[in-house]
Amino acid sequence: MTVAISNPAAPPVSARAYLSVIGGTCALLCTVGFVVAFGVFQGYYTEHLLRGMSEFDIPWIGSASIFLLYVSAPICGVLVDRFGPKVLLIAGSIGVLVAIFMISLCSQYYQIFLAQAVLLGISMGFVTWPPFAVVSRNLPHHRGLALGVITGGSSVGGIVWSIMIEELLTKRNLGFPWTVRVLGFTMLPLLAFACISITEPPKQSQPQPRPALEATVEGGSASPTPKPEYASLPLLRSTVFISICVGFGLAFLGLFNPFFYISSYAAGHGASAQTSSYMISIMNAATLFGRVIPGIVADRVGHYNVMIFVLLASGITSFCWTEVRSLTGLVIWSIAYGFSSGAILSLQGACAGKIATPQNQGKAIGFLQGSLAVTVLVGSPIGGQLLGHYGYLSLSMFTGATLVMGAVVMGYARLCLNRSPMEAHQFRFLLAPN
């Protein structure tokens, strides 16, 4: 059987679409970017504000924040598909700012947990997920690049917030409360711009033409075009979708461990406190390029193909973690891991969006992110337990193993695209590189 595919020409990109990308970048700079800078907070809490707490207790603040960020994704996905992004963005932005200013008043573990984990985590979810659905709808022909750019905002945030905290706390001696308040005042205009600029594409007066998919079998007869109602088949019945949820779930068990523990590893190998904190900034700077460049490549050679490669690359890099002992080597290692892991974070939305109709982009991305909530909750505390009992070697082996297992499952999902043509029809897959 021969499959011929004709794609409609990509429409010109509107100013509205560009503004949505910029607004989404600002949104993720203030949300995920703040989360990935938690390593700096963790170091300060361990040495000063929460001195005496165990290596197991403090990571729960960051993990719970990420958990609530991800567990809110399915709800946000459904709401943004139904009501649009504005209400979610405004409510979430207010919640983020309230949480930031509440952190500045905290001095006890339970207070920090309620403000930085619970309130901030939930509020960030309402700001983080709407841009993914809106940008996917605005730029369907450049989804990998567009989502790479907006997730690049989290990399910029990880750099900016880490350096700001370090500068204000140690060099300016501003104190923890006012340092956190400065962060909040910096976020205010960025979140306001995100609320204004992230808008849905204009509704079409007629349904957009679907890609023509014609199949010719031996004997000259052609198979019928897939029925439109196939597009509404529930995602949770898709073998491919279930496989990518499992694959990302395994990978996310260890994905964030280097971001949380690279500073303490550097300090343990002779780096100064300032240099150790800058390791997080170096890693986040590398993720910026990792989120954008692989997105450009993935739009050409396939999102699933690139995802499998970067999962394997991240896993192999993690296995080499404890073999790096010099400062120069640690910088190179941080760049390598940051680049490959950045691609994982940016392309997951493109992989999910590939199997959904334009109207269901929010649901597809939301269900995927929601399925990762438990693994991101327990991943870093498990890493902390391994570190406390067995050292960094066990932490690096755990991180590498989860990423490689994720790559294997993603490889299975990739094979399912070729072996299940009916499911490909049902989800409007193009039988091209995936």
From Swiss-Prot:
Its annotated compartments are:
Cell membrane
Q: Name one Pfam family in it.
A: MFS_1
State the PROSITE patterns in the record: MFS
Q: What induces it?
A: Expression is up-regulated during co-cultivation of A.fumigatus with Streptomyces rapamycinicus that triggersthe production of the polyketide fumigermin during the bacterial-fungal interaction.
Membrane topology according to the record: Multi-pass membrane protein
The alphabetized UniProt keywords are: Cell membrane, Membrane, Transmembrane, Transmembrane helix, Transport
Q: Might you report a single GO cellular component term?
A: plasma membrane
The transmembrane segments are: 21-41, 60-80, 87-107, 112-132, 145-165, 182-202, 240-260, 278-298, 301-321, 327-347, 364-384, 393-413
Q: Where is this region: Disordered?
A: 201-225
Q: Name one GO molecular function term.
A: transmembrane transporter activity
PANTHER family, per database record: MFS-TYPE TRANSPORTER AFUA_1G00970 (PTHR11360:SF250), MONOCARBOXYLATE TRANSPORTER (PTHR11360)
* Protein purpose: MFS-type transporter; part of the gene cluster that mediates the biosynthesis of fumigermin that inhibits germination of spores of the inducing S.rapamycinicus, and thus helps the fungus to defend resources in the shared habitat against a bacterial competitor. May be involved in the secretion of fumigermin.
The record's similarity note reads: Belongs to the major facilitator superfamily. Monocarboxylate porter (TC 2.A.1.13) family.
**Protein name in UniProt:** MFS-type transporter AFUA_1G00970
